[in-house]
Every structure is written in C-alpha cells, then in structure tokens.
Amino acid sequence: MTAALELTGVFQHVGQRCALAGIDLRVPEGAWLLLVGRNGAGKSLLTRLILGLDTPSAGGVRILGQDLQSLDSRALATLRRRLGVVLQGGSLLEDRSVIENLVLPLRGRLGGRPQMARAARLVIASLRLDGLENLLPRSLSLGQRRQVELARALIHRPDLLVWDGLSDGLDPAAIFDTLAVLRAQRVNRPLTLIATDNRADALGDGCDQVGVLERGRLIFHGPPKALDAALPQRLDLRYVLTGRP
C-alpha cells in the first residue's frame, strides 16, 4: 500500500539536546495515526518536521510520495496545498471573520465568492458552528476556535490532515462531533490523519495506529489493541496515556 508518510532515521537536535532520536515511521495512505506522549515528548516537534516547517538534523521525511528535503520552495508550497493543518497555538487571522478565514484555502481552487461561501457554510454546519460566520476569532471560545481551525483545514478536502493537539480546548461533545465529521470525510476517499494528543484513546475506535513518543524516541508503533501488552513494565506511562493502571 502506498505510504502517505515515511520517516527514516530522523534525528532532531535543539541546541545541544537530542530532541528526536532515530524515528522510523510509515503510515499507509488512508490510515489514521495518533501520536501520543507526555508533554515534552517531541510530538509537536515531529509535527513540524512532517509539515516541512523545520528540517531534520539527520534522516529523511517523505510526504505523499515526495522527499521534503529535495523540494524547492515552490514545490513545497504546491505539496502543502494537498495538506490540511491544525497547529497548537492557533493560526486564524484575527482581523478576519470566521467565514473569511475559512475561504482562504479555496482561493484559486473553487470558482468565485458564492461557491466559496457555500463550501464554508457546509463545513460550518457539519461542525455545528452555525451563527459564528461573521464573528471575529477573538469573540470565540477556545473550543470554537479549534473547530474553526479544523473546518479551514478540511474545507479544500486535503489528502492528509495533520492535527497537533487533537483534544485541546474541546469538550467531549465537540470531540464526538469532530470525529463524526472526519469519519464522513473518510467514506469516499482515503483521507490520511496524523494527530497528536496526550491520551491514546483520543481518536476512539477510528484509530488504526498508535505511536508512543517518550523523550524523543518512538517506543511503540502499532495497533491500539497492542499498546497495553507493549508497555507491561511502564505502568506510569500507561496510566498517563490510557487512564488505566
């Protein structure tokens, strides 16, 4: 099966510290991977490498069949048009309304303003964000902001969605709605999802693979049902990731 993501021997140094050490990872097209670990384990740093925002100190990163290190700025920009991205810290334009933020990825792709506005309203409705279209981001709660960021990441139907901090700011009902939208997107096309969180159950039963990062090392990568057996002596880590002793 074609790989949506391949990491080979990836190292990343931050100053004198080795923040990521020898990461090997392969995610098939259409699979859902949840990267989990405690704060500081390297999840966000790895996300930035996957997106080409940082360059690894050593090793290779391939996204949707393309070697990131071999791409010039124009080719990288073209590749990123196939990605949907939700990062921690937020990326909404504070002086633009919700609907203006949502249509940004559609410029040059989907007709004129009426078509773009219709697409934005459809994704707003799917996430139950009706009534927020004309508000500025500063008027939104943290959970609403995160969902608007997700809506913007999905509006152009990306091949790969990268979501750093899956449950950040979202209550259980919002997480349920969000996962329902992602499952619907997955029905007719191979949407690949790479998400990060502190908990291994964040994706529910939609998760195909779990990767566990601990101090910059990938100590487990496999199906969720194999996680407990893979960490028999790490009761502290297992409790943090699953809530089970």
Residue ranges of predicted features:
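Helix-to-loop junction immediately C-terminal to a conserved catalytic motif
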Residues: 51
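ABC ATPase NBD coupling module
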Residues: 68-84, 230
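Conserved ABC ATPase "signature" region
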Residues: 115-132
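Conserved ABC ATPase signature
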Residues: 136-140
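Conserved catalytic motifs of ABC-family nucleotide-binding domains
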Residues: 157
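Catalytic Walker B motif of ABC-type/P-loop ATPase nucleotide-binding domains
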Residues: 161-165
